[in-house]
Structures are given as C-alpha cells and as structure tokens.
Amino acid sequence: MTKLAAAALALCVATPALAAKVAGVEFPDSVDVGGKTLKLNGAGLRKKFIVKVYAGGLYVVEPSRDAAAIVAADAPKRVRMVFLRSVARSQVLDAYRDGFEKNSPGPGLTGLVAKLDRIAPAIPAELKEGAEMLVTYVPGEGTTVVATGGGSATVEGKEFADALFKNWLGAHPADEDLKAGMLGR
C-alpha cells in the first residue's frame, strides 16, 4: 500500500459522519446546544428483533469512535430519536431500566432507577410514529429529556447522564448495530 493510500484510508477511518439519513430520517451534521455546536458523531437504527423502533443520532462536541470516552467526557452531548412506530412510555422506561441494570450495576443502581421517575413526565403516554425525543446532557445543568407531545424534565448530575448514555454506548447496549452507527462505524 502506498503512503498516500494509507493516509487516505486513515483519514476515512478517523473522520466521523458529517450528516446521515436513516430509515428516511435526516440527521443534520450539527446542532446547537446551549451556545455550543455539537457535531453528528453517527446515526443508526434501533430494532427490537426485526421491528424498526427508532432512528437515533448521537451529537458530541468532539466526534470520536471511542464509546467509553464519549460517555466519560464531561461535555455536552445529545441523542436524538425519531420513532418509526408507536411506543408506550412504559416500554421506553423499561428499556432504560434494563440498560441501567446491564451497564451500571452496583450500589448506585437503585438511585439511578428512581431518577427515571423524574423524566417520565417528559415522555407522553405514547410516542407516536414520527415523534421525536431528545436526551441532552449539559455539564452543570444535568440531563434534559424532551419529547413530542410530552414536556421537559431535567435530572442533575453526571452519574445519571453516564448511565443513560450507556444505554446506547455501554458494554451492553440495547442494540449493537445502533451503537455502531452512533459511533460512525
């Protein structure tokens, strides 16, 4: 392999997704969060068995393919979900609880699960097809959840943000293919 070809390949591997379209859902290459520009790290499709549940995109300050580094960074980040089918709030919260148990076990688990009750009012009883949900972490403010047809709720602290973002990026994500997409792989 020539040096030029090797350099071009390295650049392609190191360059994050600039914009994406997943299952007909467009993800812009950047979004503004609290005066900071977050870049699209990657996007993918959440499936449950063979059913398409939502298209999801991950936005971060500094794009990376390192899931642990993204979760650990005390920097703004966002996951945008656009639902491709109707999903009940209880299903969303159950999925988050399951993710907490798999990715954040230990003595703090009970407190993390209890904090889910604080975001529940932001999620409507049913997220209809086409509904959007944003999960945004901002240092010093916490994690804010906003959903179409719902409200807005914020949970303070980075620990909750880490646990929630591990649902997509942890060692045991809800969907490996979605994780790979969000990491631009």
Language-model features: locations:
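Flexible glycine-rich active-site/ligand-binding loops centered on an Asp-His dyad
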Residues: 152-178
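Sec/Tat signal peptide C-region and signal peptidase I cleavage site
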Residues: 15-19
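Bacterial N-terminal signal peptides
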Residues: 6-14
